[in-house]
A protein has these predicted regions:
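An anion-binding loop in the catalytic cleft
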Residues: 221-224, 228-244
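Generic recognition of short, well-ordered alpha-helical segments
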Residues: 21, 78, 178, 240-241
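N-terminal Rossmann-like NAD(P) cofactor-binding subdomain of oxidoreductases
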Residues: 1-119, 126, 218-221
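Short, solvent-exposed amphipathic alpha-helical segments in soluble enzyme
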Residues: 2-4, 82, 182-186, 243-244
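C-terminal substrate-binding/catalytic lobe of Rossmann-fold NAD(P)-dependent oxidoreductases
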Residues: 94-99, 103-228
Length: 244
């Protein structure tokens, strides 16, 4: 399709990672190594420059290629990016992300883990230290080798919540109210992202069935920023994001 000049918005993981060795480490040999570098990451709120370049190529009669960000990377990156890009996060310390997703995030194939009698009334971590979305989040946020990511499966049909713990940079001492203002300024031009008031946290029920995302942020007394992001993994983070 690309060779024929067709612009492609890909919802799989084939074009999310730009570095072939990293792709092969976490997945397998890339299906199209030569296309990885030119693919724009499909997360409009955070990768506008890449998407604008793809749009320019398309306007010039060339094919554009977009690799839509995955579900966990979407919620996690939306939650963490404003603080990181503002320089408030220690650039040498690990960042911890714990995320919870509903069972439809695993796809429609029947498995023991997603079978009703196994998933109902059950919460469990999986892919600990090995989940393939780890390098994608690191790439978007510039956290190479510093992300501790642990996904969890919850008995929800739809909805994903990511909690990101970010160590404050030396000398940084924002208040929660200042962070809320920072986040709202950051997403002022992003109508699908809402930032909650100080003391209020995102809820999966508020975004399920939509392409919207909610973010929350607070300062922890231990010198941390705790940022949370909620989305519907079938909307923002999948098909809906492709449309966006």
């Amino acid at each position: 399709l690309i060779a024929a000049g067709v612009t492609v918005v890909d919802l799989s993981a084939d074009f999310r990672l730009k570095d072939p060795p990293i792709y092969e480490k976490w997945y397998a040999p890339p299906p199209a190594t030569d296309l990885l570098a030119q693919a724009a990451v499909g997360l409009p709120e955070l990768t506008g420059d890449e998407l604008a370049a793809a749009a320019e190529r398309r306007a010039a009669g060339e094919a554009g290629l977009v690799g839509c960000a995955g579900c966990y990377p979407t919620a996690t990156s939306l939650a963490a990016a404003p603080a990181i890009r503002a320089g408030l996060v220690d650039a040498a310390a690990p960042v911890v992300a714990d995320a919870v997703s509903g069972v439809t995030g695993a796809g429609k194939k029947a498995t023991e883990r997603t079978h009703y009698c196994c998933a109902n009334e059950n919460l469990e971590a999986y892919g600990v230290g090995t989940h393939r979305h780890t390098p994608e989040i690191e790439q978007i946020l510039g956290l190479e080798g510093r992300l501790v990511f642990t996904p969890h499966l919850a008995p929800l049909n739809r909805g994903l919540l990511s909690t990101v713990t970010l160590p404050l940079a030396p000398g940084a001492a924002p208040t929660t109210e200042e962070l809320v203002e920072l986040y709202r300024d950051f997403y002022a031009a992003s109508p699908l992202v809402s930032v909650m008031d100080a003391g209020v946290q995102p809820r999966t029920a508020s975004v399920a069935g939509t392409c919207r995302a909610q973010g929350g942020v607070a300062v922890h007394p231990a010198g941390m920023i705790v940022a949370t992001g909620a989305s519907d993994h079938l909307g923002q983070g999948a098909a809906g994001q492709g449309v966006e």
